[in-house]
Regions:
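Beta-strand-centric surfaces of beta-sandwich/beta-rich domains
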Residues: 1-177
Length: 177
């Protein structure tokens, strides 16, 4: 599904484009892993870079993949467990629903600067964190409504046969830039 944001674009023809600033001083490493063992990974890529001085206080870019499938009870999925200096720049969440219920009331919680008992930021629901509201539901069609903006979106909904159905899958993003 098309995704049109400032940091990442998914365009027709299987074009995946990433515009994150990724400074490096000596070397850079970009790795890809094919987790679909049923298909061979075919890849075309282009990396644009400049050899310039990197300021001493410039932050590095770090990305990681996590999976919890399925969650059980009150188990929380850790989106990012990085500790130390830095700036959290965003989340991409691929989510598949395993039952016929509303799935989005999970609070997004950020624990920063040593906070442990109470989150520094505590959201009200998954759809609110991804800048949607009221179940991402289009009130006229009574279906999920895809949207894509520069900073947040739900660009993909894979529908089996209707609203609130098991095995519906979603692609959501939120950039903090």
């Amino acid at each position: 599904a098309q995704l049109s944001s400032l940091a990442v674009c998914v365009n027709p023809g299987s074009a995946f484009n990433c515009y994150w600033k990724m400074p490096f001083r000596k070397k850079a490493r970009i790795t890809l892993e094919n987790i679909n063992t049923a298909e061979e990974m075919r890849l075309y890529y282009q990396i644009n870079y400049t050899l310039t001085e990197v300021p001493e206080d410039e932050a590095y870019f770090h990305a990681q993949f996590r999976r919890s499938n399925p969650t059980q009870g009150s188990l929380h999925t850790l989106i990012d467990g990085v500790k130390g200096k830095g700036q959290y720049v965003g989340t991409y969440l691929a989510w598949r629903v395993n039952d016929n219920c509303w799935w989005g009331e999970g609070e997004i919680k950020f624990y920063m600067d040593g906070d442990k008992e109470y989150p520094t930021i505590c959201g009200t629901g998954t759809e609110d964190y991804f800048c949607g509201s009221y179940n991402f539901e289009n009130q006229k069609t009574r279906q999920y409504q895809e949207f894509t903006t520069p900073y947040a979106g739900m660009h993909q909904v894979i529908r089996p046969d209707g609203l609130y159905r098991a095995v519906t899958a979603f692609g959501l993003y939120r950039w903090h830039i």
